[in-house]
């Protein structure tokens, strides 16, 4: 029989996989289960592996696979529903799904040959480490499933660096950005610093300052006066090649 925490984590991972196609990050799991450290998540995952409920796909990011769920008789009753906590996390990691007819064009995209996909401009590499200048090479386009996109204009960027790995964003990943100059606290954004540098970080407003937070303890949070940072878009999706 699983412990309550093991069962809650299994439900959490299964729900996230069904919703997004990949498992939640360790930070999201830690927050959802109200644990103080990621080591607790590691222990729970190892226990679920040993009992044959989970499988880890090694050398892949956020690659947990639910093999089976416990039978009803052996399931503990969780104190709270595991899908309720903000593991759904920053809105950036829950891509909007467009409902209804897709016969009309979406602003900012080109139609792809596949009716279920559109082509977004691929603007180059963005730093998830030290900021680098984004390239606007609009001769490159990327085919993206249409249900990843919300309203408005979108573009894609390739990630360079490792400062967002705890948010499940790795060097070489392609991020899908919804163009916007507004973002809520905690959202992962494309930030333009001093009109010269572009970086992908989590945004935090602190009075008259803006903090750009990494998701890797080896990198430091950078804090700027609010007038030095402009939001260029919000992260809504991620593509990865294996």
From Swiss-Prot:
One of its GO terms (biological process) is DNA repair. Keywords: Autocatalytic cleavage, DNA damage, DNA repair, DNA replication, DNA-binding, Hydrolase, Repressor, SOS response, Transcription, Transcription regulation. The record marks 128-129 as: Cleavage. Pfam families: LexA_DNA_bind, Peptidase_S24. Its EC number is 3.4.21.88. Residues 26-46 bind DNA. One of its GO terms (molecular function) is serine-type endopeptidase activity. The active site is at residues 163, 201. Belongs to the peptidase S24 family. Homodimer. Represses a number of genes involved in the response to DNA damage (SOS response), including recA and lexA. In the presence of single-stranded DNA, RecA interacts with LexA causing an autocatalytic cleavage which disrupts the DNA-binding part of LexA, leading to derepression of the SOS regulon and eventually DNA repair. This is LexA repressor. It comes from Granulibacter bethesdensis (strain ATCC BAA-1260 / CGDNIH1).
